[in-house]
């Protein structure tokens, strides 16, 4: 069962990296094109996903039981 925990953490780490990259690209688009409603909404969605990933990654396993 330990391998499942380490595999889960690896998946979360990859997903976190992907979200951070998307956020950087989106921030660059916002800087280049201004505040468009679609871009700001997409940024909010990415920030919520990133918040959930951080909560999942840094919550002790005992509190999830």
Curated annotation (Swiss-Prot):
Q: Which domain of life is it from?
A: Viruses
Name of the protein described by the UniProt record: Non-structural protein 5a
Organism in which the protein naturally occurs: Avian infectious bronchitis virus (strain Beaudette)
